[in-house]
Regions:
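Bacterial N-terminal signal peptides that target proteins for export
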Residues: 1-11
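Extracytosolic secretory-pathway proteins
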Residues: 26-205
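Bacterial N-terminal signal peptides
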Residues: 10-19
């Protein structure tokens, strides 16, 4: 009986040690308050109250290059892509401005092939590595069709991924970041509905 207990103890110790070693071998790219985390480039399609925003990260803090190429830097070589699926919950008109509020979910992917803006599905073809709740405010100038946005994401799921033989985790559960877009809306009814670029910065929880 004593021998059995000793074997059980050592098996447990090995499992704990292995788990600790695995955790320590992972590099977490932290979400830090006031630090620029991601640079984003994308497009969006609106249909009724539904909005899908998709694109890639052109810069990620912690990585020297967010592309698989050092010369071609666009959606075809992006290592990280994202898709946001959101629903409009409020629209307020004020002079030349239309203010739109949305909520939804954002997923960041480790891309596994060239993405193509003519096929939005290619931006979700990779491995999901971060999921977050999302709330957005859009301020659209209806005279110029230009817009600015601010939105907050709170991370709800993070998956370990491997890049160049190193295990990473993008962000931490419960942490939040704020993103600002500058964009141009397309002609109503045209595809895509518009284009945008911006940055994400860590925010205080």
């Amino acid at each position: 009986m004593r021998a059995t207990r000793q074997v059980s103890f050592w098996l447990t110790a090995v499992l704990v040690f292995t788990a600790a070693a695995t955790a320590s071998a992972q590099t977490t790219i932290p979400i830090t308050e006031q630090q620029v985390l991601y640079e984003v480039i994308g497009e969006f399609n609106n249909s009724g109250s539904a909005s899908q925003q998709y694109g890639y990260l052109s810069g990620v803090t912690g990585f020297d290059n967010a592309f698989s190429s050092t010369t071609t830097k666009n959606e075809t070589t992006a290592l990280f892509t994202f898709v946001t699926n959101a629903t409009t919950i409020q629209v307020v008109n004020h002079g030349a401005f239309r203010i739109v509020d949305r909520t939804g979910t954002t997923t960041i992917y480790l891309n596994n092939g060239p993405s193509d803006f003519t096929n939005p599905a290619t931006f979700s073809q990779g491995m999901p590595i971060q999921v977050s709740n999302y709330r957005q405010q859009v301020i659209l100038n209806i005279l110029t069709n230009t817009f600015l946005t601010v939105h907050t994401n709170t991370v709800t799921d993070v998956k370990t991924f491997t890049l160049n033989g190193v295990a990473y985790r993008l962000g931490q559960l419960g942490k939040s970041f704020r993103t600002n877009y500058s964009g141009q809306a397309n002609t109503p009814g045209a595809v895509p509905s518009g284009w945008f670029a911006g940055t994400s910065t860590g925010s205080k929880n």
